Amino acid sequence: MSASSVELEKIRNIGIMAHIDAGKTTTTERILLYTGVNRTVGEVHEGAATMDWMEQEKERGITITSAATTCWWKGAKINIIDTPGHVDFTIEVERSLRVLDGAVAVFDGVAGVEPQSETVWRQADKHNVPRLCFVNKMDRMGADFYRCAEMLVSKLSANPVILQLPIGVSESFVGVVDLVKMQAIYWQGDDFGAKFEYREIPADLAEQAALYREKLMEKIAETDDKFMDKYFGGEEISEEEIRAAIRAGTIGYHFVPVLCGSAFKNKGVQPLLDAVVDYLPSPVDTKDIIGENEKGEEINIKPDPKAPFVGLAFKVMNDPYVGSLTFVRIYSGTLNSGDVVINSHGDNKERIGRMLLMHANSREDVKSETAGNIVALAGLKNTSTGDTLCASGKVLTLERISAPDPVIEIAVEPKSTAEQEKMALAVARLCAEDPSLKVASNEETGQTLLRGMGELHLEIILDRLKREFNVNVNVGDPQVAYRETITQSYEIDYTHKKQTGGAGQFARVKMLFEPYDDGEFLFESKITGGAIPKEYIPGVEKGLVSVKNKGLLANYPIIGFKVTLMDGAFHDVDSSVLAFEIAARDAFKEAAKKLGLKIMEPLMRVEIVTPEEYTGTVIGDLNSRRGKIAEMEAKGNARVISGVVPLSRMFGYVNDLRSSTQGRASYSMEFKEYAKMPDHIAAELVDKRVAN
């Protein structure tokens, strides 16, 4: 079946998202097996999974970049984005969800709703993505489907509607009860679960199945008046009517269908595929995308293949065989190989060359794609993640994909000067692929600084420098991205005057500095009556920014302050933009003593799951790291400890936690906020920075 011949109603753009180790990559592998894309099965723990195609992913058994793949099921075209579950890679999840119409949230049947599950769920909420839940690993000891369903309510505030019940638990898990058909589905044999059969519901589950069927029908009735009248009126309701009502409720965000299975044991995946086709939205079921035209007016963009082309570049990556690949979601119109399109963010033209449908690390050439589809474009020169591509003559801009600020940095330098240029090119390529990776230069040492979302994130980047680009680097210890801020308001009237032979320099500025909680930095000019000519005012802001970027206390960037230019004076001959830049810069430095400068540190939200007997040890250790415990709850024989800890005290924590709990505890961590560092610790940090 050719890609472009598929009707819009038959397209499903879905993401598979979950906590690390919940089994989403294995689930995707089974989907590819049953839809005929894979002939053999790749296992994550063997390092052979198709979707995990980067070397680092194969070694670590985690999914790092969203690999896109296309498959077909029952006449529907399914574009799948396999998203990472590690918190260091939330930018991958964020940008994937931005371009998807629906999602499958995979949960570990033993662990239930884990911290990263909450993070990706919040991201899906933010983008209004309808979703299904798949409770995986039902074959594992301790798996509890019903507890998982309860956690969807208590942890995620979801409204689950249960469509299946498990038959058997842990090793005796053999199938599911389908509450829509009211039949049991059994998998057996050594054919990787390809064959299954419908039977009568087992007698010992009949009563429970009837109870949950009633709950299902009542949940649907709450969201559909016609259905309610029929159901409570005792009329017969067909399977098709039930499915249509579940679809409407899912797409309308009224509830979340819940299914179960064991991807690793090849059970429950085909009904999950059926549910993707039956219940998740097509591009025509979602809200229109909003764009802006050149006048700044909002425009509704409909998924019409005959309208002018509009697409969003949601991912740029380097393919070892094809080179640069840009993944684009087509929101409107048709894109053909050979077309010339406009990148509305840089106003550059791009010629469309090879167009590819991707299957993890293999590819299929196509000549044309229409609205609703996801396609990879080879060789675009000037397009980055978040850019809008559109037809020339109809320039529109879509909202960009926002990357979080980095919280950790490392210094890198090439092992030989001959590799300096090679490293710079490699780093530039990696930054184009990954908006959450930032690069800067240490002006004092000349070293390149890589800034990212966590230790694992930067480890992977260093690994890729070596493997993909053959760049060997020396690496410094990880450093926390501290900030400075002001805590007191102060007004300064400062004059910069310099007279040497010939023209001199003159600029006077009167400025008010004050704390500002609503953002990083705000500059405002209240100059009236020509006290300072308009063309000199950008010089004032430039001088302030130069100090802001370098810091005053310990050379960390300054955030959270506002400067108002109140008044000033100029000289007809001696004033210039440069003179006002110097005046503002020196005034800022002069005011420093009065601004109550403080050091800010990144705080991390931490969640630790530990066996009960190590609870005291774990809490004591967190307290010693200046952590604050927010809550603690029981989860079976384990304890879940949530708290907030400074990032500076969390380096190498995974090894300390393993040794103190004999490897039985696990943790996750994500950035929470910047907060003022205690004065005595800040003083030590400042002394150390000044000494160096």
Swiss-Prot record:
UniProt-annotated location(s): Cytoplasm
Domain of life where this protein originates: Bacteria
The UniProt record lists the keyword Protein biosynthesis: yes
Listed GO MF terms: GTP binding; GTPase activity; translation elongation factor activity
Major subcellular site: cytoplasm
Keyword Protein biosynthesis carried by entry: yes
Coiled-coil regions, chain positions: none
InterPro entries per record: EF-G-like_DII (IPR053905), EFG_II (IPR041095), EFG_III (IPR009022), EFG_III/V (IPR035647), EFG_IV (IPR047872), EFG_V (IPR035649), EFG_V-like (IPR000640), G_TR_CS (IPR031157)
Domain tr-type G, residue spans: 9-284
GO BP, sorted A to Z: ribosome disassembly
PROSITE patterns from the UniProt entry: G_TR_1 (PS00301), G_TR_2 (PS51722)
Residues bound to GTP: 18-25, 82-86, 136-139
Keyword line: Cytoplasm, Elongation factor, GTP-binding, Nucleotide-binding, Protein biosynthesis
GO CC terms: cytoplasm
Job of this protein: Catalyzes the GTP-dependent ribosomal translocation step during translation elongation. During this step, the ribosome changes from the pre-translocational (PRE) to the post-translocational (POST) state as the newly formed A-site-bound peptidyl-tRNA and P-site-bound deacylated tRNA move to the P and E sites, respectively. Catalyzes the coordinated movement of the two tRNA molecules, the mRNA and conformational changes in the ribosome.
Protein family: Belongs to the TRAFAC class translation factor GTPase superfamily. Classic translation factor GTPase family. EF-G/EF-2 subfamily.
Protein name listed in UniProt: Elongation factor G
Native species: Neorickettsia sennetsu (strain ATCC VR-367 / Miyayama) (Ehrlichia sennetsu)
Upper taxonomic lineage: Bacteria, Pseudomonadati, Pseudomonadota, Alphaproteobacteria, Rickettsiales
